[in-house]
Structures are given as C-alpha cells and as structure tokens.
C-alpha cells in the first residue's frame, strides 16, 4: 500500500512533469517583447522583496536618519513602481492576446487576483512611512474604508497593524499567488499568438 507521500509525489509528477516545470526550450514566438513583461514583473518583485527585507531588518525609522536607509527606501519605492507598471502591461498584453485560450483561464485569473492583492500591499506601504505623508493618507483613507465596512478589522490609523500587513501577510499572499501563477503557466504553456487564419500553425491544440 502506497503512503500519502508517494501519492502526493505521483500526483505532482502527473500534473507537472520535471521537463514541463523546468523546460530547456521555448516556442519561437516568445521572442516577442510582449512576453517579456511577465519576467520583468518577477524581476521587480525580487528587487522589491530584497530591499524590503533590508528595510524591515533595520526598522521603520532607519531610512529617516541614515543616507543608506534612504537609498534602500528609494530602491524599494522604484521597485514597487516598476512592479505595478510591468504587471499592468503584462495583464493588458495577455488580455488582448486572449490568454484564456487552451484551458489557461485560471492562469489569467490568478494574475488578476495578484494585482488586486498587491494594491492593499502597496497601500499599507504608504501607511508605514512614519511621516506626514503617511498620516495624511491614513486620515483620508479611513473614511472610505469605514464606508466599505472593513474599518473594524483594517484600521489605517493603527501603525502596528498596517506595518504587520505590509511586512508579512500581504507579501506572503502576493508571493503565493505569483508562485501559483507560474506553476499554472508551466503546466499549460505560454499562450500562442492569435492565429491570423484557419491554417495558422500557431493555433493551440
């Protein structure tokens, strides 16, 4: 009788074989620039996580008093800006390419959900600055959030809560969604361009 570990391994191999998880070649159409936005989004996320980790280790006030801290804070900010820019370009590019074709709908939806989760992650980052800017954002945002009924468990005026959300909970959710998104892409393959004619060889099976 096989154990649960064997069943789990067999299930994983059946859904995502190693040669599919880590391929050594890609279709020729992947050389198009529109396919680069996904990789650029992941690259921005890596820089974002590394700079954020350094800022977290030094504490929330470090960047106010040290030039090196201000440097890493600037790196973190621009990584966020590029992350959202590349992700929006990636989402729009895949939407106009009809990336839900060939059973890829879950991959497209996971990317869209990741974008939605990244918004409050960035919002809590602005609330964690510990300056007048973060205070103004918190006071202006609380009324809108209270009107939505989330103020009881998500209080922008509570720095500790917002810092915890920004440092741990929301980044974990974003990384998990990105990881799931990559696995779905590996499983189904990257979406081919929309065929120009009925006999086009790029038509998915």
Model regions and ranges:
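Membrane-embedded alpha-helical bundles that constitute the cytochrome b-like, heme-associated redox core
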Residues: 1-205
